[in-house]
Amino acid sequence: MAQPSARVLQSGMRLPPMPTIRELVKLYRLQARKQLSQNFLMDERLTDKIVKSAGRIDPRDLVLEVGPGPGGITRSILRRHPQRLLLVEKDPRFGETLQLLKECASPLNIQFDIHYDDILRFNIEQHIPDTSQRIHLIGNLPFAISTRLLINWLDDLAARRGAFRRIDTCMTLTFQQEVAERICAPVGGEQRCRLSVMSQVWTEPVMKFTIPGKAFVPKPQVDVGVVKLIPLKRPKTQLPFHLVERVVRHIFSMRQKYCRRGYGTLLPPEDREEVAEKLFQRAEVQDTLRPFELTVEQCLRLAEVYSEHLVTRPEVAAYDYRAPKNVEVL
C-alpha cells in the first residue's frame, strides 16, 4: 500500500497559496535579533536551492530543520513531501508563522512537529526514537552556534548516536563563507585548520554554493556558504572523538609553526622534545611540516601514537600546558 506522502505526490497536491515570507515578517512585525545571530532568507529560489542541495528527499524520509525562523526553508522542504518534518526553533516569536505553515501543510499528510528549544541541548533520540526513517539535517544556522553545533554533530556521528544512528544522515547547513571554506579546505590550502581535519575524518564536505550577504535581512557583513556533509561509510579512524579533537586542536594551535611545536604541547616539558621526536618517528610524519600541510591520515597517525603513549604514561592525559606553574613561595 502506498504511503500517505507518496499518494500526495501522485495526486499532485501542493501547498495552498500563502503570503510570502516577506509579507509574513511584515504582518507579524518580526525583526531579526542580533543577540541570536538571526538573518532571514526571503528569496524562495535560494531556499529551494538549499533544499535541493540536500539531495533526494523520499516520501518516507524525515527532515529536521534547525532554526526555521519565519519558515522560508520550511516551505521549500514541504514542497519535497517528506513523511515527517521536525522543526527546532529557539525563538517562540515565530510561533504564529510556523503554525500557519503547519495548518497549510495538513492536507499533505506530513507529520509536522514544532519544538521551541535550543538545538545545542535538543535530545534528538527522544524525539526520533527509532531508525526506520532516513534523516536529513537542514538549517540556515545562526553564525554564533554554527561551529559548535557542527563539532557536536561530528561527535555524535563518531559515536553513532543522536541523528547518526544511521550512516546515511547527511547535513546541509549554512555557515559564514570563511567557515564554509575552512570546513572544505584541502591539504595545503590557505583556510586549512582544525575544523577542516575534524570534518574530513568522518564526512566528505562539499561546498554547494555561495549566497551573497545582500540576500539576507538584515544583511550580514559576510557572504554565506552552503555545505553538505556526507558521512563516510568507513570512518578513517576508530579512535575516540575527544582524543582526535584534542590532538588536532593542539597541532593547529600554532598553525604557522612546525607541527611538532603544537603537538609538543600535549606532553609535559620534562621530556617533551625526546618523546615528541619518538612519536613523530613512530607515526612516520615529518615534524617540520606546517599543520596545514598535514593530511587527515597523518593527523590520525599522530593521534594513534599519542593514544598508545597514554597506555604507558596515563598521567600525561591530564597534562594541560596552559595550567599555571607551581611557584614556590619563600
UniProtKB/Swiss-Prot annotation:
SMART domains: rADc. Residues 1-84 form a transit peptide. This is Dimethyladenosine transferase 1, mitochondrial. Belongs to the class I-like SAM-binding methyltransferase superfamily. rRNA adenine N(6)-methyltransferase family. KsgA subfamily. Coiled coil: none annotated. The lineage of its organism: Eukaryota, Metazoa, Ecdysozoa, Arthropoda, Hexapoda. Its EC number is 2.1.1.-. Probable S-adenosyl-L-methionine-dependent methyltransferase which specifically dimethylates mitochondrial 12S rRNA at the conserved stem loop. In contrast to mtTFB2, it does not have a critical role in either transcription or regulation of the copy number of mitochondrial DNA. InterPro entries: KsgA/Erm (IPR001737), rRNA_Ade_diMease-like_C (IPR023165), rRNA_Ade_Mease_Trfase_CS (IPR020596), rRNA_Ade_methylase_Trfase_N (IPR020598), rRNA_adenine_dimethylase (IPR011530), SAM-dependent_MTases_sf (IPR029063). GO terms for biological process: mitochondrial transcription; regulation of translation; rRNA methylation; transcription initiation at mitochondrial promoter. The gene is mtTFB1. It comes from Drosophila melanogaster. S-adenosyl-L-methionine binds at residues 38-41, 67, 89, 118, 140. GO terms for molecular function: mitochondrial transcription factor activity; RNA binding; rRNA (adenine-N6,N6-)-dimethyltransferase activity. It holds the Pfam family RrnaAD. Encoded on a bicistronic transcript that code for two proteins mtTFB1 and CG42630. Keywords: Methyltransferase, Mitochondrion, RNA-binding, rRNA processing, S-adenosyl-L-methionine, Transferase, Transit peptide.
